[in-house]
From Swiss-Prot:
Key words, A-Z: FAD, Flavoprotein, Methyltransferase, NADP, Nucleotide biosynthesis, Transferase
PROSITE patterns attached to this UniProt entry: THYX
Leader sequence residues: none
TM annotation in the entry: none
Protein's name in the database: Flavin-dependent thymidylate synthase
Record carries keyword Metal-binding: no
Active site (record annotation): 203
BP terms from Gene Ontology: dTMP biosynthetic process; dTTP biosynthetic process; methylation
Stated role: Catalyzes the reductive methylation of 2'-deoxyuridine-5'-monophosphate (dUMP) to 2'-deoxythymidine-5'-monophosphate (dTMP) while utilizing 5,10-methylenetetrahydrofolate (mTHF) as the methyl donor, and NADPH and FADH(2) as the reductant.
Cited NCBIfam families: thyX
Entry binding sites for FAD: 88-90, 192-194, 198
Amino acid sequence: MRVRLLEATENPEELICQSARNDYMSDWVGDTPLDTAMASVDGDTTDEKLSNLIAQLLTRGHYGPFEHPSATFAIEGVSRSCMAQLTRHRHASFDVQSMRYVAFDDVDPAAVAEGELVVTPPSATDPDWVGRNQDAGDIDEETMAEREAVFQASVRRAVEDYQELLGLGMPPEDARFVLPIGTEVNVVITLNPRSLMHVADMRAAADAQWEIRELTEQLLDAAAQWCPHTFEYYDAEMKHRKNRLAP
């Protein structure tokens, strides 16, 4: 799994703060320099003022200004299961790699058992891993080895069957039906800081599945490089308060 920031609003936190100050100014923000708009905010430098105002907005629950900037992220190599969870957040915009137009006919099925093309869940290899709705806890080495072997054989066979169906002339859009839900997919997502914080409220939580938790952490890390004061405050003061930022 990898996440990369593709494109984003420049100076997003200046935009957030200008938008927020608009609500309390008699002058038109369109004609007002940033320093003037921020004159009444505590801080010795513009950066301190931005940080302080952003903290105030988030503390008070004034989330509207965080909807003005937007960022687009490229996501590589998440499972179709994780993608389905992510795209339930309908306030974001998505493009998803197509299995109708992209055929995986050059993938070595032997490599699939080692993690290529199909995401391997931790419970397939880690005997100490405990997931939700799990029937058993600790397992012996023999059972763990059998579990891993069954998983690897299953995903390898699925890819072999998929490629055989392609060779028999079945279109990719139909042959894909035999591929597992763990098949990797690339996604492009666009959303604003408020929306991303809402995603994190739900998907960085302990009861979210491991893969989307990892994806959410990578999105937050990338967003912190773009919008640092916002996501540093969110991480320190607001993270894990589930659903507080519901749009």
